[in-house]
Amino acid sequence: MDGIVKNLSFGNEAKQKVFKGIEKLTKAVSSTLGASGKCVIMEDNSGNPIITKDGVTVANSVILRDPVENMGATLLKEAARKTVREAGDGTTTATVLAHSIMKAAYNDSSDRDTRNGISSGVIKVLEYLKSISIPVEGKMIDDIATISTNNDKKLGVLIADAFRSVGETGVVTMEPSEGGITEVEIVEG
């Protein structure tokens, strides 16, 4: 005997369960969206409470009892994880967008229709963003940095100063520090 299979799902039943997992994860993560997003309270591995607005942290904490639903949630978690690896932020937005795309696919849209819809949407979003964009300067840099740190003013000022130091074409990267010390290091080159 090659192995024991405990649970098999096929066809529409499997599709419904996978999408149910996607819906559950989206509901948990989307509540944190944007500057007015809500905080989520959850347990860490030791059972201690954690309060966060970070989408990927919320996503990673979700484990669904039903293994097929959990597969759906895991698909969506990957979108959040990839976003945090590539961009460092925007995980909640990526989760909401990935949910919308998966919902279109779930509702029997053809692959071509889904692909064309995404392409059309990307063009429209880029055009819209270009039409409303304004240069970020002065105190706006401090405000944006502070918002991105969940309103930690001290850390926001530190990040804003780092961006001012490197200028428009410079790059700011963040790494965990040893000993929990927050500092800015400028590397030329």
Positions of PLM-derived features:
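N-terminal glycine-/lysine-enriched basic segments
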Residues: M1-E188
